[in-house]
């Protein structure tokens, strides 16, 4: 059973909003009590929270499906449904959240950092909230909006100040155990280290963290060995340290060629966090070289021979023996100095100020386009019309009429006519496809009909904007004529 998991794919589903309630107040001695249906509760959201006590993504490996509770349905007597509680999911420090396309959504660093991974759906309005002068007692309510569903990739990138990189069996784990209290697995065979090991190092009054990652081999950036899976753990490191085995007996290997091979892998690796200005490219990080295993006479001689050649690259060189504990103190204080210089040279992070961009006044909020998959059909896109369709109960004619009114006021019907839509053509809004009938009069005064029905849906003639204007003028003329007749009768 794996104990360390640093990459998982999870399925997050936020809670749906509760449905609104369609209810009429009934009480003794209170006729015409009016609508009293409450609103549905908001669905719970899924929120990632950094917990310093969590160090792996193992829990997500066994439970990749995460669901937040939904909101409760509204009830009569103006009682709103309870909102679904937000689900707070604990993640390790250094977790990176990617969407299904690999796009970076959040970089969670620091205890208590929060990120809303999936937003809960809004609750539907009850008929009490939908009542108006034209529709005094609606016989319908709006449905709750479905919660957001997302497929996310979580990657754990170790938060450490120093990253130790080197070939397998170079002595990286031994070095971590020698300069810190960490106790990684140490053995005399390659790839002993299968997971990153962290150690806390004391440099006088200061402390810093060191990460030991599995050994790299040529081609690690392309997926060979374990390097591709664990190179991400050095992305956050301020200083990279090449740990070189000066006592290796492998043919064709020497300290210079090992350093060149490691540098080639760093240059070929593309960090996920490349957009973070505080990190920069891996090849731009400060680097040091540790020539290890100098307790072997031949290794010490080789280290002394190549020391000046490596120093010409501008990197500090340390001769170390973890067995004899030689050269550890100069290494520790040298690394702390490099960390301090790197951090002081980084630009100060300025907190981002929230920017509010109001929707332009002339923005209709929707777009009508021909459907490329079906000639003669149209697609209506936009946040508002798509949300309205999701919240409509199509088993209720009055709710369908209300949707038609909203779309007409938004201008969808007029835009379809302008683009040449014909009766019976398919119109898709969100996940719903309609057979558009322009004869259905929308946007006019609601006529009296039974609750849950809409008499306009039974008519076959379409009433346009000009006809509605003429009807209002005729009603005003009729009212004026009736008022004049009444006044003449009173004078007589």
Curated annotation (Swiss-Prot):
Q: Which residues bind GTP?
A: 166-173, 191-195, 212-215, 292-295, 321-323
This protein is called GTPase Obg
User: Coiled coil: which residue ranges?
Assistant: none
Its principal location?
cytoplasm
Per UniProt, Mg(2+) binds at 173, 193
Segments of this protein annotated with the region Disordered: 441-492
What is the scientific name of the source organism?
Answer: Mycolicibacterium paratuberculosis (strain ATCC BAA-968 / K-10) (Mycobacterium paratuberculosis)
Per the record, the similarity remark reads: Belongs to the TRAFAC class OBG-HflX-like GTPase superfamily. OBG GTPase family.
| Obg domain residues | 2-159
């Amino acid at each position: 059973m794996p104990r360390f998991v640093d990459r998982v794919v999870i399925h997050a589903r936020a809670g749906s909003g509760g449905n609104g309630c369609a209810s009429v107040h009934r009480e003794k001695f209170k006729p015409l009590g009016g609508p009293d249906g409450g609103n549905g509760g908001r669905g719970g959201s899924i929120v990632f929270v950094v917990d310093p006590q969590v160090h792996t993504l193992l829990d997500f490996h066994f439970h990749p499906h995460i669901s937040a509770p939904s909101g409760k349905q509204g009830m009569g007597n103006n009682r709103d449904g309870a909102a679904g509680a937000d689900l707070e999911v604990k993640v390790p420090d250094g977790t990176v959240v990617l969407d299904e396309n690999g796009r970076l959504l959040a970089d969670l660093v620091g205890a208590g950092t929060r990120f809303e991974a999936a937003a809960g759906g809004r609750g539907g309005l009850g008929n009490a909230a939908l009542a108006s002068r034209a529709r005094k007692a609606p016989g319908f309510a709006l449905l709750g909006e479905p919660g957001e569903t997302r497929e996310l990739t979580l990657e754990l990138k170790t938060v450490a100040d120093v990253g130790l990189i080197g070939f397998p069996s170079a002595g990286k784990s031994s070095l971590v155990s020698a300069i810190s209290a960490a106790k990684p697995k140490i053995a005399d065979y390659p790839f002993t280290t299968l997971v990153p090991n962290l150690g806390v190092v004391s440099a006088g009054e200061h402390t810093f963290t060191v990460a030991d990652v599995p050994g790299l081999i040529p081609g690690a950036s392309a997926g060979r060995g374990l390097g591709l899976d664990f190179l991400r753990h050095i992305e956050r490191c301020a200083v990279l340290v090449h740990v070189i085995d000066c006592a290796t007996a492998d043919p064709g290997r020497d300290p210079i060629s090992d350093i060149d091979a490691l540098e080639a892998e760093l240059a070929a690796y593309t960090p996920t966090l490349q957009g973070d200005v505080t990190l920069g490219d891996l090849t731009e990080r400060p680097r040091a070289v540790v020539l290890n295993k100098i307790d072997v006479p031949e290794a010490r001689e080789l280290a002394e021979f190549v020391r000046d050649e490596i120093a010409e690259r501008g990197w500090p060189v340390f001769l170390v023996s973890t067995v004899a504990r030689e050269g550890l103190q100069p290494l520790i204080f040298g690394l702390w100095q490099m960390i301090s210089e790197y951090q002081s040279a980084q630009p100060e992070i300025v907190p981002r100020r929230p920017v509010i961009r109001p929707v332009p006044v002339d923005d209709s909020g929707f777009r009508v386009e021909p459907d490329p998959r079906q000639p003669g059909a149209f697609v209506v896109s936009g946040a508002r019309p798509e949300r309205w369709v999701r919240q409509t109960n199509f088993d209720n004619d009055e709710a369908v009429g209300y949707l038609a009114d909203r779309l007409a006021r938004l201008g969808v019907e007029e835009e379809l006519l302008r683009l040449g839509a014909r009766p019976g053509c398919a119109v898709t809004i969100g996940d719903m496809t309609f057979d558009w009938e322009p004869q259905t009069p929308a946007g006019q005064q609601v006529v009296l009909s039974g609750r849950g029905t809409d008499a306009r849906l039974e008519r076959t003639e379409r009433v346009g904007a000009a006809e509605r204007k003429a009807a209002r003028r005729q009603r005003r003329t009729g009212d004026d004529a009736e008022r004049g007749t009444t006044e003449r009768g009173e004078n007589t």
